[in-house]
Swiss-Prot record:
Name the UniProt record assigns to this protein: Glutactin
Disulfide bonds: C123-C145, C298-C316
Modified residues (Sulfotyrosine): 26, 29, 182, 559, 645, 727, 836, 862, 865, 868, 922, 928, 981, 984, 1006
Organism: Drosophila melanogaster
GO CC terms in record: basement membrane; extracellular space; vesicle lumen
């Protein structure tokens, strides 16, 4: 009984298995009529019917004889109900230190036990500069970064291998960008590679020490490692497809053209990038090296570098830490960013590298059909939106009505200078209308500028890459126009005045769930992702994206047909024969001759295709107008089994080929007719360019001479100022010594005069020579007050030797001459101070003008240097004239003072602030008669006032205390006590203000005292009346 039940169970299992079929990949639709014809193959159950489940980390062990025991993560993710193992951070090469960081890596040997459960850090890049510095401070090796990640389904066996090369701009990114969530729904292995970036992968001196193109050697080393070991992970080494994104596509294509890849990979998928991209080829690697060395503070290479001449640079680069070299590269990008993509360096491929990867230009290698591989190649619709958005501000500042001005800005940032004229002619012929050439505005020409940059950077390189290879190997063209919910970068958030559909790397969002915020797709995006993944995996498996239908035929020319991914829900996949018709410039087939003969075109079986009809100028006007209302591109009566439709399609294709050839011949004929007229114009343009260059060199030379002259003038002014200050210090010292000598001589004469002069006044006299008088009757002995201050209050306390206190002394002629000389010296000093003050004022005005930004116009503001020199001479002559007039006025003023001093010598005496009254100012002959008479009149007036007020109290006589006398002496300021005359004036002004304030306070006190006395007097009068 038990054997019978076992047999029945086995039979039932077979029947169930037969009814269910193989493992479901997509949903099946039972209704064949409702199945959409654009689908690449019949739909099966939805792979994303449930969210990805993360299992607990367990070890997945792989034994690789050349490597050792590799421990990965078993069940890293569960995708489509199937566990996926992950092997992360497996080293495939080793990088040395010092200068070896810029050279080819060495294969890694047997490692024993390898821990492949942790994601390895990315190679050195400036977005992770802080991490590099922290790792270096810990003593970690940040240069040994050559690792790869492998994702394999559980139980994989001889599956095709997809090797992803991350890219964009070749100076950032890492292997973590390739996640298995979408791709591993299919039976395929996914590998992602880390390689050296920026200067460590591309800096070149075209020598063995700095070869360049080291990133290509890293990729080759990783692919060699996979050829030996991928079989142990369940992969097929004979079915390796290299998938590159942007810059990664450039590396993948360049490696295939190098001829050194051999059988390391068999097919290519190039997304928005080829080896012919103009902005990823460095045509001047030595200039880039020189600029980088300067920013890294290393000795730059000489003009004709040699091995011995480059040794100091090598030693410096080997000595610097990795983080400092990365920081120097970041400065290189920021410094040259305004020059455009074609002028940036340090992250680009070089031609003629010693490693032999690019012995000649990639365009020349692309003409060799023996190096061609089957490929899927294309680009996103608006891949160059990122560059147009970055230069949009420059375009907005033009405000021009001529479209040529806008084209020049775009070409400066996107195309090599040698191709500017060719691309400009093509743009005016194929993109812009004649009306826009004279009535342009940024809003109207911006879509055309975006289309022009797309052709230069992406579509033209695609067309030129397959212009010869499509004859010998299959090539499938595509353009990704689909605009979904998520985008790879923020290029769509730009100031462009129109919508952008798909920008750079947006197609990768539907191939890998990266970045993490783009990992959750809506139903429409998931449908597009399923179609894209299926085609990519089908190509990796069979070499044909759609083996079961004719939706995507291979290219029959460099222009198509091509497949377009769109937002049209009725037909998301559209076929169009015009990928880039009309792009004949630049013609690389003429610039780079083919290296081998081409094989005849291969014969393919006729397939049913769906085409769209476009004009010969598909983007002549606004290509984005009414795109949502575009009619369906599919024939209403189309059916793959309709032979009439097939014949009609073939006839249309033949007609299209004939029309294209006719237009090409007509264009060549027009070019030949214009050639005789263009040649003189080109010669004239070249002559004008040479003249402008000569004028520019002369202008720069004159500017250099002018800067040197200004520098010399500045040094001369500084020297003169220093000499003037030194002279002033010496002059002050001499004046100080002369004053001291005069004072000493004066004291000696004063000591000698009392001995020589006879006494002529027998009467007793006071110290001032006045006769001693009897007390006047108006003195009040009771209160001691006098109606006016007595002469005794101004007595010379401790100053008997001063000239003004000596009553018997008259000024002699010798003293007067000395004082006149002193006056002349003071006037000379004041003259010098006024000149110095004028000079300071002029310098202050110049500084204020510079601070306000009112600088004098430079040579560039004048039509020619002669007019600038003439204007500069006029300004200098005007300044000299003003200065001469100032000098002349000062001289006339000085002569006037001298004449007055000669006519009135007694008025030229210096005015000094006396400590005591100087009566010579009132009476020069010392008779004192008038003074005595005035004193008697004052006494009589005071006596009369006292008689009128007999009872008024008399206040005490005010006498100065010794402290007040000392303070009065200290209040006298002398010029020699101050470092400059300005300081003396400031101190004198301050002292005068203090004295005035003190006088006001004394006056208020006196007024208050008078009021108090009046009040007391009034009180006495009232008492007396009572």
């Amino acid at each position: 009984m038990k054997p019978l039940l076992l047999v029945l169970a086995l039979c039932g299992a077979q029947v169930h298995a037969h009814s269910v079929g193989l493992r479901p990949d997509y949903n099946d639709y039972s209704d064949e009529d409702t199945r959409r014809d654009w689908l690449p193959e019949p739909l099966k159950p939805v792979p994303w019917q449930s969210e990805t489940r993360y299992a607990q980390p367990q070890e997945a062990v792989v034994q690789a004889p050349e490597v050792g025991q590799i421990l990965g993560i078993s069940g890293h993710k569960t995708i489509a109900n199937r566990p996926v193992n992950a092997f992360l951070g497996i080293r495939y090469g080793t990088v040395g230190g010092g200068l070896a960081r810029f050279q080819a890596a060495q294969p890694i040997g047997y490692q024993g036990r390898v821990n492949a459960t942790v994601q390895s850090p990315n190679c050195a890049q400036f977005p992770e500069l802080d991490r590099l510095r922290l790792s270096e401070s810990r003593g970690e090796n940040v240069d040994d970064c050559l690792t790869l990640d492998i994702y394999a389904p559980e139980g994989a066996n001889q599956l095709p291998v997809l090797v992803f090369v991350h890219g964009e701009m070749l100076f950032d990114g890492g292997s973590e960008e390739a996640q298995p969530d979408y791709v591993l729904e299919k039976d395929v292995l996914l590998v992602s590679i880390n390689y050296r970036l920026a200067p460590f992968g591309f800096l070149s001196a075209l020598t063995d020490e700095l070869p360049g193109n080291v990133a290509l050697s890293d990729l080759q080393l990783a692919l060699e490692w996979l050829q030996r070991n991928v079989v142990h992970f369940g992969g097929n080494a004979g079915q390796v497809t290299l998938v590159g994104q942007a810059g990664g596509a450039t590396l993948a294509h360049a490696l295939s053209l190098s001829g050194r890849a051999g059988n390391l990979f068999q097919q290519l998928i190039l997304q928005s990038g080829t080896a012919l991209n103009p902005y990823l080829i460095d045509n001047q690697p030595l200039d880039t090296l020189s600029t980088f060395a300067r920013l890294a503070r290393c000795p730059p290479p000489s003009i004709n570098p040699s091995a011995q001449g480059l040794k100091p640079l090598y030693d410096c680069l080997a000595r610097l830490p990795t983080s400092q070299l990365v920081a120097a590269f970041e400065q290189l990008l920021l410094q040259n960013e305004h020059l455009g993509l074609t002028q940036l360096g340090g992250f680009k491929l070089v031609v003629g590298d010693p490693l032999g990867f690019l012995p000649s230009h990639p365009a020349s290698l692309a003409t060799n059909s023996s190096l061609a591989l089957p490929m899927i190649i294309g680009a996103t619709k608006d891949a160059s939106a990122f560059i147009v958005s970055r230069i949009y501000d420059q375009l907005a500042r033009l405000q021009s009505r001529n479209v040529s001005d806008y084209i020049d800005v775009v070409l400066r940032h996107t195309a090599p200078p040698s191709e500017h004229r060719l691309w400009k002619q093509w743009a005016l012929r194929e993109i812009f209308t004649p009306i826009q050439e004279q009535t342009a505005s940024l809003q109207t020409v911006a879509p055309g500028l975006l289309e022009l940059s797309n052709y230069i950077l992406y579509r033209a390189p695609v067309i030129n890459s397959i212009s010869q290879s499509y004859r010998s190997v299959p090539a499938y063209l595509y353009t990704f126009d689909y605009r979904g919910e998520h985008h790879r970068f923020g290029h769509l958030s730009n100031p462009l005045p129109f919508g952008v559909d798909a920008s750079l790397s947006d197609d990768s969002v539907y191939l890998f769930p990266y970045p993490p915020e783009a990992s959750r797709l809506n139903p429409l995006d998931r449908s597009l992702s399923r179609a894209l993944v299926t085609m990519w995996v089908n190509f990796a498996t069979t070499g044909v994206p759609n083996p079961s239908s004719g939706v995507w035929p291979q290219a029959t020319s460099e222009y198509g047909p091509f497949l377009r991914f769109t937002n049209n829900q009725q037909s998301p996949l559209e076929l169009d024969p015009h990928f880039g018709e009309g792009i004949y410039l630049p013609n690389y087939r003429v610039i780079y001759k083919p290296t081998t003969n081409f094989s005849p075109p291969i014969t393919t079986t006729t397939t049913t295709t769906t085409t769209t009809t476009t004009t010969s100028r598909p983007y002549a006007y606004n290509p984005y107008a009414n795109w949502q209302n575009r009619p369906s591109q599919q024939h209403p009566n189309w059916h793959p089994a309709d032979p009439e439709y097939v014949r009609a399609q073939e006839a249309r294709q033949q007609e299209f080929i004939r029309e294209r050839e006719q237009r090409r011949r007509e264009q060549q004929l027009r070019d030949q007719q214009r050639y005789p007229q263009q040649e003189p114009r080109e010669q004239q343009d070249e002559r004008i360019r040479q003249q402008r260059e000569q004028e520019e060199r002369l202008r720069q030379q004159r500017e250099q001479e002018e800067r040197l002259r200004q520098q010399r003038e500045l040094e001369e002014r500084i020297r003169q100022q220093q000499e003037r200050e030194q002279y002033e210090r010496e002059q002050q010292e001499r004046e100080q010594r002369e004053r001291e000598e005069l004072e000493r001589q004066q004291r000696e004469r004063e000591q000698q005069q009392p001995e020589q002069q006879p006494e002529y006044n027998p009467e007793p006299v006071n110290p001032w020579g006045y006769p001693v008088q009897e007390p006047q009757p108006d003195d009040n002995p009771e209160d001691g007050r006098l109606p006016y201050p007595s002469y005794e209050q101004y007595g010379p306390e401790g100053n008997e030797n001063l000239p003004e206190t000596d009553a018997n002394r008259n000024f002699s002629e010798e003293d007067r001459e000395q004082q006149q000389q002193e006056q002349l010296r003071r006037e000379q000093q004041e003259q010098q101070e006024r000149e110095y003050q004028l000079q300071l004022e002029r310098e202050q005005q110049e500084r204020e003008q510079q601070e306000r930004g009112q600088q004098e116009p430079g040579p560039e503001e004048y039509p020619s240097y002669e007019e600038y020199s003439r204007a500069l001479q006029e300004k200098n002559a005007e300044r000299d004239r003003i200065y001469a007039e100032e000098q002349e006025r000062e001289r006339q003023q000085q002569e006037t003072l001298l004449q007055e001093n000669q006519q009135h010598p007694e008025q030229s005496l210096p005015e000094e602030q006396p400590t005591h009254p100087n009566y010579e100012a009132y009476d020069g002959d010392r008779s004192y008669a008038e003074e005595q008479e005035r004193e008697q009149q004052r006494r009589d007036q005071v006596e009369q006032e006292r008689e009128e007020q007999p009872d008024e109290d008399q206040g005490e006589e005010y006498e100065r205390s010794p402290d007040e006398e000392e303070a009065a002496e200290q209040d006298v300021l002398k010029v020699e006590d101050f470092p400059s005359y300005e300081a003396y004036l400031e101190a004198a002004t301050k002292l005068r203000e203090e004295q005035e304030e003190q006088e006001k306070l004394e006056e208020e006190r006196y007024r208050a005292q008078q009021e108090e006395e009046d009040r007391i007097q009034a009180e006495r009068e009232r008492n007396s009346r009572n």
